[in-house]
Amino acid sequence: MLPPLNKKFSFIIKTAFFTTALLAVLLYLFTPKPDITQPNAYSTAFYDSSGKLLRLNLAADDRYRLWTPIDKIPLSVQQATLLYEDQDFYEHTGVDFIALINAFYTSYIKRSHRVGASTITMQVARLHFGMNTHVIFGKVEQILRALQIERHYSKNQILEAYFNLAPYGSNIEGVGAASLIYFKKPAIDLNLPESLLLSLIPQNPTKRNPIKKSAKLVLLETRKKLFTRWLEKYPEDKHWLAAMQLPIKVYASSDLPFEAPHFINNLQSEYPHLKPGEYKTSIDLNLQNLLQRHAKNYINRRQRDGLSNTSAILLNYKTMEVVAELGSVDFFNNDISGQVNGVRAKRSPGSTLKPFIYALAIDEGLIHPLTLVKDAPKRFGGYTPENYDQQFLGPISATESLVLSRNVPAVNLMYRLQKVGLYDLLVAADVKKLQPKEFYGLALALGGSEVTMLELVKLYAMLANLGVYKDEVILKKDAAVINQNNPNSPNNPNKHIKQLISPEAAYLTLQMLSKNSAVDEISFQKERRQSYPVYWKTGTSFAFRDAWSVGIVGPYVLATWVGNFSGEGHPSFIGRQAAAPLFFEIIRSLDSYGLIKGNIKPGGLNITEVDICSTTGDLPNVHCPKTEKGLFIPGKSPIKVSDVHREIYIDKASGLRACQYDEFTTTKAVYEFWPSDLVRLFKQAGIVKRQPPPYLDSCLINNTSTQGSAPTITSPSNLISYTIRASKLKQESLPFSATTDTDSRILYWFVDNSFVGKVERDTPFFWHPQVGEFDVRVVDNLGRSASVSMRVKLVQ
């Protein structure tokens, strides 16, 4: 029973009551619905693919505030808060008028001590509208707003708003952020002791800040009292009694994780349309830590060799998810510009683009994996590529040429491509910031352009996906992504799906890459838990600025880079020596965890396995001494029966070559008949090939002209047109050259059937040109011939 009041005070109370009631009715009936779900700003939380927190950002107002729906807030938190703050929450209409009058009398009339009577709804009104409820008019407004809120929102919606607005100490607001910071877990995973602790903080967040030692002791004591009340209402929870006596670990905001920093920074900068909220990324924190650990240990071991920084990325080519991204070895090391993201920075790729030249050449029918290509000095206009070791190996298979990273064969194949070139492929694969095609020329084959590590691994993923290019995925499909219909959304993996290389060409290229041995092949084979291929390639950029290793293993594309963000070169920055060891360390670690599973074994490809003559790369004839299994694409790959190994007749008496077989005077022998240009390359490479002996003098020209291969004119090209200045006509000379069979010795040159000169095999003949159209013919000493047409015209 309230004590009797004097008439004046009674009048004030009645007037205030009726005025408030009138305003409440007007507010209830005519004011629009307030939006209590939207404070000034929310934080953004990024998680790994399994839900581990990677980073929690401050909101725009420098507070941690994370929107958490009511169904993600455990009942223990809801019930503990209502038990402590508002036991009649589900009965009142937003204001507990009896409690309010009692509080008013105690606080303002009796003045014994301050008593609060705010309901959960009233607290939502105060927190949302930011009103000062320590004065009468502020309290009146709070009451009116609470009634307004109750009209427009359900109890669950009001409770949800409270748990997202309530202060939990320092700059932490909302139970979602409080749970992540204080207990390193989402709110839904809070247990009863943690729930009780959190429910006490909003009433006095400054004095009950759990990270303050003095406040924590008071908080724990208050929690014991609340738990006693809890057991009166929920006696079935008495099994928590022992846990309530144990110390509770509480973390501070300074303990928040800062994982995959380059990845998260890029995600935020590249996709600014992402609204604040919670996002599950493609990152696997276990794999991220694996890359970080190996990179750090590797650089520490190799610092004496001049290695100070590295970047790496691991992409699951089946899902196209970036599961680990390491932009630098140390994000916080300013000496190496650690905050630069090496995965997204443009760098010269060195030789890592060569596999795509070979894939395009296979697709165009220029080669198959065992086709012989020429590793020899060759001039392409004003461009003369050289090999890293300054040596030339002569004729080698396309597979050897690729895994040994020979430059001339790669440039020559790129030069011969007619349909789709390497530049066209890079454009189709959405490689950014390319210069015009003419800017690079043939140097593009050797790393003349710049790509990012991410662009590079997507190209290799395209090979693993049998020529199908897809974009990367950096957010999980179930992430709370804004603008899901936006084609540029970061979890829209289907925005760029296209077949860039045929499945057959991609598969054959992978088989070629699998022949590349590991850096330490013997130990690598011993340490493997199981047998699996590694389809990989190294690269070294000009002036030793970048060392690369990139490849496919199991379901992953892995790339490692070693270098300096300053662009300064170092002799140690060689792909196989600097980047490959780290590449295989990571592979071994993945294997040790059983993560390398599966193999690229597609079905339904138009590929045939046949016997190939090991020496020539063609189908074997009956005289080929050794064969091996090889793959080719029927109707596309350049496959023919080899004619290099030929059986000839040797005169027993002289050892010279006979025209016809006689069982008494001749014997049979098999020799290799190589074109003269390849014979020359074998010699340059130090490879000795046994030459067939010359014919007997008694052999007539008509006996030899139909045997073996005719010469092939390499200069001039057929139907070529030469333009010569009139003033230089007398001084000009045009080179005539041809490749011949091994047994050719002399070449005779004719222009319009007029003999113009002779030279030894492999020696060019120089002709002084005339104006007009001409037929040029060459005949070797055995009577075999070839011809081309050419034209010479003058300009003044």
What are these regions (language model features)?
Residues 262, 310-347, 351, 359-360, ...:
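Active-site beta-strand/loop architecture of penicillin-binding DD-peptidases
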Residues 79-82, 230, 291, 320, ...:
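Active-site SXXK
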Residues 1-49, 108:
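N-terminal type II signal-anchor transmembrane helix
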Residues 106-134, 258-269, 367-422, 469, ...:
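Conserved catalytic neighborhood of penicillin-recognizing serine enzymes
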Residues 183, 216-217, 431-490, 494-500, ...:
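Active-site-proximal helix/loop microenvironment
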Residues 90-100, 173-176, 236-238, 336, ...:
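Short, well-structured active-site flanking segments
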Residues 23-25, 112, 116-289, 293, ...:
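Non-catalytic, structured segments within soluble enzyme domains
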Residues 4-9, 13, 47, 244-256, ...:
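Soluble, non-transmembrane domains of envelope/secretory-pathway proteins that act on or interact
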